[in-house]
């Protein structure tokens, strides 16, 4: 434990928190071919592989995931939310931060309803999270 004088001289340093979505913190200067520090809420990328993964214990399922090469050159694993999707290799997608608790290493979500990603069909609740359009009212 430091003495009072040591604290007066040096003070306490605040711990720096590491980002939960580090790939969104980097940009890319294509002229200089260097990464830059440029935070973004989302990033565009191209799917390099679309596959399924099994979750950690005690869960059991086939979670849909995609390996995405971002516009800053970083390749990440991202989760495809919702039921059914139209993604394949070379699809252009938008990713956001947000981990999937039972898939280790999956720290990003694909945004549904933007770029090449279609919204979830026949979705009636929480539509904005899945890029689903408002359904037409039924005729009476």
From Swiss-Prot:
Signal peptide: none annotated. Keywords: Methylation, Ribonucleoprotein, Ribosomal protein, RNA-binding, rRNA-binding, tRNA-binding. GO terms for cellular component: small ribosomal subunit. One of its GO terms (molecular function) is tRNA binding. GO terms for biological process: translation. Residues 1-44, 120-140 are annotated as: Disordered. The modification 3-methylthioaspartic acid is found at residue 102. This is Small ribosomal subunit protein uS12.
